[in-house]
Amino acid sequence: MPDVTFKVDGQTLTAPAGTLLLEACKSHGIEIPAFCYYPGLSLQAACRMCVVRIEKMPKLQTACTTPVAEGMVVVTDSPEIAQARKATLQLLLGNHPLDCPVCDAGGECELQDMTFKYGAAESFYAEPKNHREEQKWSPVVYFDRPRCILCYRCVRMCGEGMDIFALGVQNRGSSSVIAPNIPAQLSGVIENGVELAQLDCEQCGMCIDTCPVGALTSGTYRYKTRPWEMNHVATVCTHCGDGCKTTLGVRSVTDGSQILRGDNRDKSGMNGDFLCNKGRYAFDFANNIERLTSPLLRKNGKLVPVSWEEALTFAGTRLRDLREERGSNSIGVIGSNRTTNEENYLLQKFARAVLGTNNIDHHRTADFVTLATSLQGTTGTFASQRDVATSPAILIVGGDPTNQAPLTAWNIRTNVRLNKARLYIANHEEIKLRRQAKAFAPVAQFGYGAFVKSLAEDNDFSKSLHAEPKLIVLIGNELRGGELASLIKALPNASFALLADYANSRGASDMGLLPDVLPGYQSLQGSTIASEYGAADAPGLDLLAMFDAAAAGKLSALYVVGSNPIKRYGIDPAALKSTFLIVQDLFLTETAALADVVFPAANLYEKSGSVTNSYGDLQLVSKAADKAGTRSDFELIVRLADHMGHDIRTLVPFGKGLRADMGQTRGASSGEADRHAVWLTANNMEPRLSPFDPFAILDEIQRLVPGYDKLLRLQLLSGNDQHLVPASTGLVQITAARKDLVLPSADNLFTSGSLTRYSPMLQDVQRHQSTETAGHLASAD
């Protein structure tokens, strides 16, 4: 839209026609206070804090509902306006409890900030304040009614943003109160003899984060600490494949540091302010008492704690001996889709350059190999997460973004609501997003191949898709191999993305945790990286074939990093009875319990590096916390290679640069590291890196991995995401005979079956949801 020119407090400003006055002023650094206004939600005009004086208007106007107009003259700060805002605050504070010293919102409360600014420090009410008992609506949502200022942000966020409508308003006028969708008499939840109202929703906590005061508080955070007592670290969520940025609130404890809160209130990252229940609450797996904190070695049939040196020496010596006695091809390596790109790259390099084997794989939750192969040489492209939020048309084939990729579902809903995007769905079951769909094509459970063929037929669904000038196609893990390739061929000029299940599923494939391709999906024969590694040119065993070989007594050793194949694939533990097994993980999983050596590993919140989400968006992972007794997977791989007698300088190109101590000891706390980094950058130099620093291998990734050669190092280290696409040719794909290599995790909003089973809060939420479901069924009877 064309720009209009207007004046605010004597300044001449411009903004696109139709822009709300409040947003236009904000973009020019002019603050107008507001409680009820929230970007992306419908306009409420309930709080009257944003009132301004507009020339030729008879009374004060709300800036949150007034669009800018040509020639408009506005005053945002005057004695009249200040008095109006002060009067509004006095009304709000009239019955607001003086809980600031104990309220979780203290220090972050918008009401607190505005009270200090506009001077409503004394109440002109003599009557005692009304008191109401705090209500527990779910394990993660608590409501304190007297604190509520009736801005209705929570109601609109739940209905418009999340499409849940679990919150509403009871009564009218001054008697209005926010209430959950399950009243006390129907909830079936009784505490201390009193029936409690309950929330039947996705437990995302978005209502809590949008609340400007402390009326809604989090069950994981309440009464534990203050905002100024925590370090706030921006990193990437460790759960699904969407790649949400999360800001973790961390406090020091005796055995390292403890994560106390997860949110993204600064709205940075591709997810804005959105986080699902896993991103917001399921960080507590890191503090689980079952975390491994000491290496374990099997002695007399039992795993017992030992020193790091004993465990590493035994594992390294045994692995080296087995390689020499039975050959490199008798050893297998299984990686993880929850470890960083740098760790995944290093692990496959360890397998190929140290062990000398291509027997390497990971739990694949989507067929990225076929996606990369099928898009080569076509007019199709790789979609980014941001494309989903802006594209005029979206097709979902299989999958359920609401459960599997909540940010994707959020972006689709927002795009449909705000931009009128057209949503098409082809699925074998009803999914929540059908409510936003323009068209729905029912598919038989195993009939996606037939659906792909129908796209070439003369039917309304197919004609609508082919008529879309710009189409984003999101593909569930029901499609793989030939069916996936056929879908891509059937929709030329579209952009495609796969819905994978874990934080770095795409990165694990991109970095070469595969038996038949190298990093960047390069061929085992003739590529630059193949000659540099000196790796074998014959494809290795995939994950399932490794266990077949183990059962046949042909796999002498198996090194498992951050994976639990015994549980995930339902493998008979007896298959490993004659295989030397090394496992590094956070917990004593079903696979780790069978191991000869177990190394306690750090999780994604306890390390630095990068991850690539399902769309190919590369993001920085920052170390937020520590756990005593654990080490990063990167360090463990390097130390294991060292204890095998391998020259680790050929594994990790560390040590280049000027000094090794800058930024690692005193510089980290004095600010000297930052100054030194700036000086080195200005002189086109880099600091010397430790062999355990994941960024020591970033240059090699840039040099050797097609697609990642386009990454901008400074942009990555600054925390900005970058959309990368594979750039290799001559790729391979999973054949029809190996479809079982892609195994969906049967993910849902409340569990992924791996990390979340160690999250007490998510387990509590899951029990709550089960109780709600049972209660509804009983009510229906």
Where are these regions (language model features)?
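Short beta-alpha connecting loops at secondary-structure transitions
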Residues: 6-7, 70-76, 192-193, 232, ...
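N-terminal leader/propeptide and maturation segments of large enzyme subunits in energy/redox metabolism
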Residues: 98-127, 626-723
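Glycine/threonine-rich phosphate-binding loop and adjacent beta-strand/alpha-helix elements that clamp
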Residues: 385, 606-628, 641
